[in-house]
Amino acid sequence: MTPLDLWLSRSIPMCLLLQSLVLMVLCFPSASTCPKGCTCQRSESPPHGLNVTCSLSRLKEIPPDVPPDTQLLQLDRNHISLVPDRIFHGLRMLRRLNLSHNAVETLGEGAFIGLEGSLEVLDLSYNRITSVHKDAFARLKARVVVDNNPWHCDCALQQALGGMAHNHERVLCRSSELRDQEGQPFMAVDADLCNLAKRTTDYAMLVTMFGWFAMVISYVVYYVRQNQEDARRHLEYLKSLPSKPKKPDEPEDISTVV
């Protein structure tokens, strides 16, 4: 066997082994790619993304190292209280996101940036959400589940949910801009809460302006009366002065003829 044949006989198996290792790295996630406390499994159905399950893992925050090819992310039943802006940016394949049974209290404008084109289901039920930014769900095509939260029904919530086609009859108003709507379903709020807030602001401005106007009028009245009182006292003082006696040869009227 020539040296060339010997080299080829050894190099070809090595090349095949190297190719196999590369394919395994590309096609199957290694243990280091899965967030701590979670399990990752490759989906058998197209597009063969990852199913990442972090349920009941006592997480206090959303893992920042979720693999970019994740298509299902289960974060339910943890202690997550905050959804940072752009935390899911880069998860372009994510279809289902489960954040139910956590301690989230509010949602900012950029909480779900990057999921507009892929997300199909977003579950936020059984949290502590009272308020959201009016654009928190903007451009999302997903079915958003937000029931069983202590909502404060205001203009921002009406703007956030009003343009969505999904039914929110189970969203109850724990508190509301309208007192008679407290404890009622959000869908039963017929009033325009945004116009209500605007009218409330207008009324406050009118009351403030009326108060200032009343103060100015009161000052003017006080100033005029004070001047009248000073003038009256001055006139009484002048009247109290003794008159100058006339001289015998002084005429009654003095006229000047030009």
Swiss-Prot record:
The entry's keywords: Glycoprotein, Leucine-rich repeat, Membrane, Repeat, Signal, Transmembrane, Transmembrane helix
Signal peptide location: 1-33
Cell location: Membrane
Glycosylation site residues: 51, 98
Domain LRRNT: start-end pairs: 34-68
GO CC annotation, single: membrane
Protein name: Leucine-rich repeat-containing protein 3B
Lineage: Eukaryota, Metazoa, Chordata, Craniata, Vertebrata
